[in-house]
């Protein structure tokens, strides 16, 4: 199971269609935004609750088949904790990729550009909240429970890996940027403190 995550506008959908199928050999994508657009093409946000339910149903179906699949998410809620634990209990190896952007303003700008091209809109206050909560939950909840994680800066193309790790080890490739990302949620922390599930 592969989790592709990041704030709105971070490039998740682009990667899920253009990069990951070839990279990991999997083309099954579970994305609540796609469900919402199918349910309510002219106002996807109105169908967000139902879309989330459909997403969970699709995940359970994929798990029941023991099939490989990709979940696309902002990681700004705790809702995937049980899914990850269930997947691991079924023998899945869970990999998490988080796309970070160097500012929330860049995220807002990208979403606006997407809307101008006919894509779906996300309210600015929601983008700002998810920008912070996604990073917070990446470090506090999700990185410690997955088998492998990769934290990448997708502010420009191609993306750059900042750090990667497992439950037993972490490799920081860009100390300054890693500290900058953690500083979003832990402003008084120095690099090396409370790193997710690891030693440096």
PLM region descriptions:
Residues 8:
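The conserved Walker
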Residues 12:
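Conserved lysine of the Walker
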Residues 16-67:
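Conserved substrate/cofactor phosphate-moiety recognition/catalytic segment
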Residues 50-101, 134:
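Glycine-rich phosphate-binding loop used to anchor ATP phosphates in small-molecule kinases
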Residues 92-140:
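A glycine- and Lys/Arg-enriched "phosphate-lid" helix/loop adjacent to the NTP-binding pocket
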Residues 140-191, 199-200:
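NTP-dependent small-molecule kinase module
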